[in-house]
């Protein structure tokens, strides 16, 4: 007997446990700013239409996402935050992270990379956020 399987299902949670824990820390320190999770890189930066490689540049960024983006009251992105677990040590992830860092640098959007931990010190994360934003502000 053939049983049709559904090709898709709704995930129970948007964030992993590590991401949820870190999100709560961010919530406690960003004040009136808005935090967005799992934002597509192509929604943060655009590929210049005049550039010869526009299509391939867009194709590259459309499948990448940033763990968290903090926006101001106008919903303008002010900083990207990546939560780096052990997978970021793999050669393919190291290359991907280097590319993402460079893309965000070109687009003038600062990025803070935070290693995954069991617990986070909100004051330390706040200090890191401010230090990362300092050259921009």
Task: Label each region the model flagged.
Residues 64-127:
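Basic, amphipathic alpha-helical patches used to engage nucleic acids or provide basic targeting signals
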């Amino acid at each position: 007997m053939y049983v049709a399987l559904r090709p898709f299902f709704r995930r129970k949670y948007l964030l992993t446990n590590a991401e949820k824990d870190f999100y709560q820390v961010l919530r406690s320190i960003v004040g009136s700013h808005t935090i967005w999770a799992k934002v597509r890189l192509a929604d943060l930066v655009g590929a210049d239409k005049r550039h010869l490689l526009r299509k391939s540049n867009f194709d590259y960024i459309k499948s990448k996402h940033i763990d968290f983006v903090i926006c101001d009251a106008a919903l303008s992105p002010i900083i990207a935050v990546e939560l780096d677990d052990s997978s970021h040590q793999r050669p393919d992830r190291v290359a991907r992270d280097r590319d993402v860092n460079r893309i965000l640098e070109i687009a003038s959007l600062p990025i803070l990379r935070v290693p995954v931990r069991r617990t986070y010190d909100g004051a330390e994360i706040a200090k890191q956020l401010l230090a990362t934003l300092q050259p921009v502000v």
